[in-house]
Amino acid sequence: MSSRLLLQLLGFWLFLSQPCRARVSEEWMDQVIQVCGRGYARAWIEVCGASVGRLALSQEEPAPLARQATAEVVPSFINKDAEPFDMTLKCLPNLSEERKAALSEGRAPFPELQQHAPALSDSVVSLEGFKKTFHNQLGEAEDGGPPELKYLGSDAQSRKKRQSGALLSEQCCHIGCTRRSIAKLC
């Protein structure tokens, strides 16, 4: 019985003495690997899946400009400095200045507004107004993309990310690449 306990303790001690794979050395990240096809996919999952890529990027460079630009467009209920009905007022262009002031001050809306509120929420006009406002705040999107992605401004960004991923996979296959360069795509 005591030999069985000692064997289990020895196994437990060996298990604990193994180095943690979550800690990654700089040499491992900077090692040049040459992988193709499924091997590239496995390497990408290995680097990005364990959040190693995020740690490597946090040490290397600040956030890209595209992420900083999208951080400016925050709904008013999240952004504490914004006025509460900022987006609502922009989407209702036919509202008089007096009623807009009442909404922005937080006073009870006029009864006429309460009876038209369901119609405004379902109307295509208010949706188009919201899309135009959202589009203007994000900046110009490429005209070649589909209209759904045109207003979101993500078509050009996602296309660039896909193209850079394809170029990197070809480079990793033919020439070789570092795990750190794969981590930039995470």
Swiss-Prot record:
Pyrrolidone carboxylic acid: which positions carry it?
A: Q163
Q: Which Pfam families match?
A: Insulin
User: What are the subcellular locations of this protein?
Assistant: Secreted
For molecular function, the Gene Ontology terms on record are: hormone activity; signaling receptor binding
Residues of the signal peptide: 1-22
How does this chain assemble? Heterodimer of a B chain and an A chain linked by two disulfide bonds.
Spell out the protein name for this chain: Prorelaxin 1
Q: Which organism is it from?
A: Rattus norvegicus
Gene that encodes the chain? Rln1
